[in-house]
Curated annotation (Swiss-Prot):
Belongs to the PPR family. P subfamily. Disruption phenotype: No visible phenotype; due to the redundancy with PRORP3. Prorp2 and prorp3 double mutant is lethal. It catalyses: Endonucleolytic cleavage of RNA, removing 5'-extranucleotides from tRNA precursor. This is Proteinaceous RNase P 2. Its cofactor is Mg(2+). Keywords: Hydrolase, Magnesium, Manganese, Metal-binding, Nuclease, Nucleus, Repeat, tRNA processing, Zinc. PANTHER family: PROTEINACEOUS RNASE P 2, PTHR13547. Residues 1-28 are annotated as: Disordered. Pfam families: PPR_long, PRORP. Gene3D superfamilies: 3.40.50.11980, Tetratricopeptide repeat domain. GO terms for biological process: mRNA processing; sno(s)RNA processing; tRNA 5'-leader removal. It is found in: Nucleus. One of its GO terms (cellular component) is nucleus.
Length: 528
């Protein structure tokens, strides 16, 4: 054999005798069990998982952990919809949970949710709520979620145990957990079924606050209540006679609801129909409102903007930046008679990303003229534009006269160097409660302020988008009405129904009304 062949042969023998470093290390019994349980969970094989569990608890080699119990409990709770497995899943699930607790292992949120679902499937809402309360009282890193409470709440509502359902809701509220449509509908249904008219009123407003458009299932619950005998017996106890108070409440709430209680007398008229493009109900001819944020929300929004703007400027280590924003606040206080705020940079730079493209003052001028034309009070809007941009425009002889005219007329404010003009135009629009013309989606601001729900509502009411097609301007004004549940000062209700395509012209609305003082030819003198 040649020397080279001998060397290769020896090297091969040595390598084959050495362990392969890339070879998978054998798993310990606990890891093996968890792997197999996860496989059973994916395939929804409850029987196989229980067999693995039974073998593990009789073995001295396996020590069950929280993950093992969690996987088993999840699989049990996921099997309760299968009639053939329901009893097995419930019985073994409770057995597994008892062993978990007796072993000194604290259940996490996922495990508690699974046990609550098992208890609810058994019809034991008390136990479902008990395990959640015990979990919350212990505290820790894992916190309850809507899904943790839902089994107990829905179980109580289904069994018409209204007071217990309300107790669960109170516990959720204390934990900072908001209801969603399924839970609100369940509470609405049990309240209607047990004749609690004040609770029905409360949960209708919960739907308005958290849901917007309702599902067909929820609509049926609402319809059954208003068509029922109890709803017709509920009067307004004189509330409806104080029309001034109701109108003021609607105004303070931002439009679309007053929240003072049932208004009107007698049976309700329930109709399903459509709403015109201008917001006129085609069933009762009532004009739907364009719902804005209320006074408290708006002021909180303005205060948040000021705080965030100041904080950003402080982080820039400039001793002047807080002063200049305060100067703008003072200036706006003196000159703040505007119906619209214009994001100058957004409009001037629109579609200018081409060779030789620059700031288009003509586009900005078109927007200004159109807003002035559409203003019923012949008012010019206010442009917010960075001082550097204003300086450049003033240096251009073609633009100088127009820009100087805007400045002298108080319709152009130059934001100072080192400042983000976004904060200026957003603050101005919020403070003055007026329109904001920009195509900016403002995604950077949403999560820093009051949350996406509030900010989305504010944008829907105040943001004006625009397009230029072949140089022709088109402004996209906010909708003349809001597609949300509405309660009028007359006591009528309008419920928009969820639809797949969200096409407003074909959306079904349920219109609910009855006789009120505003329908009477004479009043008691309280109507202003």
């Amino acid at each position: 054999m040649a020397a080279s062949d001998q060397h290769r042969s020896r090297r091969h023998d040595e390598s084959s005798s050495r362990p392969n470093k890339k070879k998978k290390v054998s798993r310990n019994p606990e890891t093996n069990l968890l792997f197999n349980l996860n496989s059973c969970s994916k395939s929804k094989d409850l029987s196989a998982a229980l067999a693995l569990y039974d073998a593990a608890i009789t073995s001295s080699e396996v020590r069950l952990s929280q993950q093992h119990f969690q996987t088993l409990l999840y699989l049990c709770s996921a099997s309760i919809t299968d009639i053939s497995l329901q009893y097995l899943a419930i019985d073994r699930g409770f057995e597994i949970f008892d062993r978990m607790v007796s072993s000194g292992i604290s259940p996490n949120e996922a495990s508690v949710t699974s046990v609550a679902r098992l208890a609810a499937a058994k019809g034991n809402g008390d136990y479902a709520f008990k395990v959640v309360k015990e979990f919350v009282s212990v505290g820790g890193v894992s916190i309850p979620r809507l899904r943790t409470y839902a089994p107990a709440l829905l179980c109580f509502c289904e069994k018409l145990e209204a007071e217990k359902g309300y107790e669960v809701e109170e516990h959720m509220e204390a934990a900072g957990i908001a209801l969603e449509e399924a839970e609100i509908s369940a509470l609405l249904k049990v309240s209607a079924a047990t004749g609690r008219e004040n609770k029905v009123y409360r949960y209708l407003h919960k739907l308005r606050e958290y849901v917007g458009c309702v599902s067909e299932e929820t609509l049926k619950i609402i319809e059954e209540w208003f068509c029922g005998e109890k709803a017709g017996e509920v009067g307004d106890n004189g509330i409806g006679s104080d029309v001034g108070m109701l109108r003021e409440a609607v105004l303070n709430n931002g439009g679309g609801w007053h929240g003072h209680g049932w208004v009107g007398e007698g049976k309700w008229t329930v109709k399903k129909g459509n709403v015109s493009s201008t917001g006129r109900c085609l069933s009762c001819s009532e004009q739907l409102a364009c719902v804005d944020t209320n006074e408290v929300e708006t002021q909180k929004f303005v205060d948040s903007l000021v705080a965030l703007a100041m904080d950003r400027k402080t982080k820039m280590n400039s001793c002047e930046t807080n002063v200049v924003f305060s100067e703008f606040q003072d200036w706006l206080e003196k000159h703040g008679d505007y119906e619209a705020i214009v994001d100058g940079a957004n409009i001037g730079l629109y579609q200018q990303n081409f060779v030789d493209g620059s700031f288009s003052l003509s586009q900005l001028e078109s927007v200004m003229k159109e807003l002035y034309r559409e203003s019923g009070n012949n008012k010019w809007p206010l442009i917010l534009l960075h001082k550097r941009r204003v300086k450049t425009l003033l240096e251009n002889p073609t633009h100088r006269n127009l820009v100087e005219e805007w400045i002298s007329n108080g319709v152009l404010y130059a934001t100072p160097p080192g400042s983000n003009d976004d904060w200026y135009w957003l603050y101005a629009a919020a403070k003055l409660k007026c329109l904001l013309v920009t195509n900016d989606e403002m995604r950077d601001h949403i999560f820093e302020l009051l949350g996406s729900t509030f900010f989305q509502k504010w944008k829907e009411r105040h943001q004006v988008r625009y397009t230029f097609v072949k140089g022709n301007l088109k402004l996209e004004m906010p909708s003349p009405f809001s597609v949300v549940i509405q309660e009028s000062e007359k006591g009528s209700w309008h419920f928009p129904v969820s639809c797949e395509n969200n096409e407003e012209s074909s959306r079904t609305w349920m219109c609910i009304s009855r006789q009120s003082i505003l329908d009477s030819p004479k009043s008691n003198g309280k109507i202003p």
